[in-house]
Regions:
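Charged/polar, solvent-exposed surface patches and flexible loops
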Residues: 48, 67, 71, 75, ...
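Residue-level detector of intrinsically disordered/flexible regions characterized by low predicted structural confidence
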Residues: 6-11, 177, 198-199
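Residue-level marker of positions within ordered structural domains that often coincide
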Residues: 21, 111, 176
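N-terminal capping segments
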Residues: 26-123
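Low-complexity, Gly/Ser/Thr/Pro-rich intrinsically disordered linker/tail segments
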Residues: 180, 185-190, 194-232
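...with weaker cross-activation on analogous glycine-rich loops/strands in unrelated enzymes
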Residues: 124-194
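Bacterial Sec-dependent N-terminal signal peptides
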Residues: 1-28
């Protein structure tokens, strides 16, 4: 009976967190730094829940945390950055101020939400290096394949957040409700920079000969986030 009560308390806490988690995109836009503080506070909430949960509740916490991360990055974090200009040497940490290169855009987003990654090292490396670290068991490579084949792969693999490395570029992919969008700091349109666009539009994703795609937020990746596990 005591065990059941403990389990129900954990589940109730998860449900409460879930309700709070998905309110961000509907709330008035906050200062970016303040919003990131809320994200880190939420991460700490998940860690406290996870540490005190039994085995069955731990799985539920991972599921909820994954949904929170995907929703927060896709619907809250990205919009802060839309319109931040691109530059090959751009390293800004603040949306709408300065410029940002494609690699720095990807690694800055991940570090900002609380992943312990070597932001500068990864931003300056080939994207395949960190894609293999973030999604070691969820990677697919395409060489000189038609865009329709890649769209089919993404739709079959399912909704979620992906990172993609190209010939000379890197960015995120959002798959949701059969819609596929490429989010990146766009060197084709440097004055616009960070933007979201259909993968089948005129962009580096469509034009690239090589593509390596990793699906983010596996159980392992979510646990690394919750437990502050560092990547090298």
């Amino acid at each position: 009976m005591v065990h059941n009560k403990k389990f129900m308390r954990a589940i109730l806490s998860i449900i409460i967190l879930l309700g709070i988690s998905f309110c961000y995109s509907r709330s008035e836009k906050k200062d970016y730094a303040l919003f990131l503080q809320e994200v880190i506070a939420k991460k700490n909430d998940y860690k406290r829940l996870y540490v005190n949960a039994d085995v069955s509740a731990k799985d539920s916490i991972i599921t909820v945390a994954r949904a929170y991360l995907i929703n927060t990055i896709s619907n809250d974090i990205f919009p802060y950055w839309y319109g931040t200009k691109w530059d090959f040497n751009g390293t800004t940490r603040t949306p709408q101020q300065g410029k940002i290169a494609c690699g720095y855009f990807v690694t800055t987003i991940l570090e900002d939400v609380g992943f312990k990654i070597p932001r500068v090292k990864w931003a300056q490396s080939a994207s395949e290096v960190f894609i293999k670290k973030l999604a070691p068991n969820n990677i697919k490579r395409f060489s000189n394949r038609p865009i329709a084949e890649i769209e089919n792969y993404l739709l079959t693999t399912g909704d979620g957040l992906y990172v993609v490395g190209l010939d000379i570029h890197v960015g995120f992919i959002i798959v949701k409700n059969k819609s596929i969008n490429f989010v990146h700091s766009n060197y084709y349109k440097p004055e616009i920079g960070v933007m979201k666009e259909d993968i089948n539009s005129k962009n580096p994703f469509k034009d690239s000969n090589y593509r390596i795609i990793g699906k983010l937020m596996s159980d392992e990746m979510v646990l690394n986030w919750i437990n502050n596990i560092a990547y090298d």
